[in-house]
Amino acid sequence: MAKNKNNQAIWNTRIKKNASSIFQKVGNSIDIDKRLYKEDIRGSIAHVEMLFKQKIISFKIKNKIIYGLTKIEKEIFNKKFEFNKKYEDIHMNIEKRLFQIIGEEAGYVHTARSRNDQVITDLKIWIKSSTKEINLNLDKVIKSTLKLAEKNIDTIMPGFTHLKNAQAISFAHYLMAYVEMFNRDKNRFTNNLDNLNENPLGVAALTGTSFNIDRNYTSKKLGFKKPTNNSIDTVSDRDFVLDFLYSVSVCSMHISRIAEELIIWSSDGFNLINLSDKIVTGSSIMPQKKNPDLLEYLRGKSGSSYGNLFSMLTILKGLPLSYFKDLQDDKEIVFRSNDTLINCLKIFNEILKNSSPNKKRMFELANSGYITATDLADFLVKNHSMSFRKAYQKTALVVNLAEKKKKKLSELNLEELKIIEPKLTNDVLKVFDLKNSVNSKKSYGGTAFDNIKKMIMKYKKQK
């Protein structure tokens, strides 16, 4: 084995001068893509097994390559592998080390493939694996949310529109809204697997190959459903990256929304949520402070996820077919979004375990702001043969009356209510009871306690 060959870039027989130092700095991606070493080695092993099956390489060469690749994987895992920026990326670092271990036979590993199809194969396998990890963390968040909801089915609070009291709800119903969102996030990540399940390996640089390869074989070996259909599209395609980044962004947005609400609700003005000392920080100057820094961190990180998505969209928008160096950034963007989301899910799960509702304050706030006004309008429609619009107008007059008298709706007596609607009897007074209000919303998906219990059981059975 010629020693000088292993110390040079693979293309040095064509390009005679060494790259400038600035180009070497910009051109290498090993600090980023070394995370793909397992996927890269797995893909290479499947590839050489296929080459042997198709009688493109010998049994001896196949075994030597697999031996070398297995040894390299152990070296990297045990932190005994020396990554060299001179060799640019994970693919060439592994190939160069393979030459050192088994000699010139290492040159057969790249038969009938290119780094163009190699890197997409690696990244697809990595995202498939990461999707499972994200969904496992989403399962934990859903489980913690269900647990908190189950404890608070009969905890009554105001539901808000425009951040103003709207109608009474169960705190559990509010939490179950986020169970729905996080469940959709899980489904969104899972649905992405369809596009991830097409095998890029074997399309080579952009045209396919003249070797008699079997792409169905490598598809099966690597856990793909089928090979991709068009070689040019395959090396150009980063739709699967966009799908992943979009899913991360939507999930981050859901986390940000509930973080924002918990920040507001834990503030002195609302005082609806108690945050444990385990998840708050103090102030360097104000001794009394307990700040929701972790929630603020989660809220801020959604912006990072959006930025990663827009970065990738912007990279792709002007690229002709097929492969360009612009695409080198895809891996860093994916890793950054992935790591941020998994970290946020773990943090949020801890927050859920260390948060509790201030039940008394929730009820007090729900009992203000004329929150049962809609219940009165519905009562008039059902019991006094009014159209909803007429009942709405009558109820608005009742609210005006209560406001004028500085009373809650529940504090108005029957005689006062009859000023607006003379036909009213004592049975109208029950509509102002908050528990009755909540439990009257029995329509599917509504906030009635029985509905919530059924929905919690439904999700618990899914786990």
Where are each of the predicted segments found?
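Short runs of predominantly hydrophobic/aromatic residues within well-ordered alpha helices
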Residues: 44, 91, 95, 241-244, ...
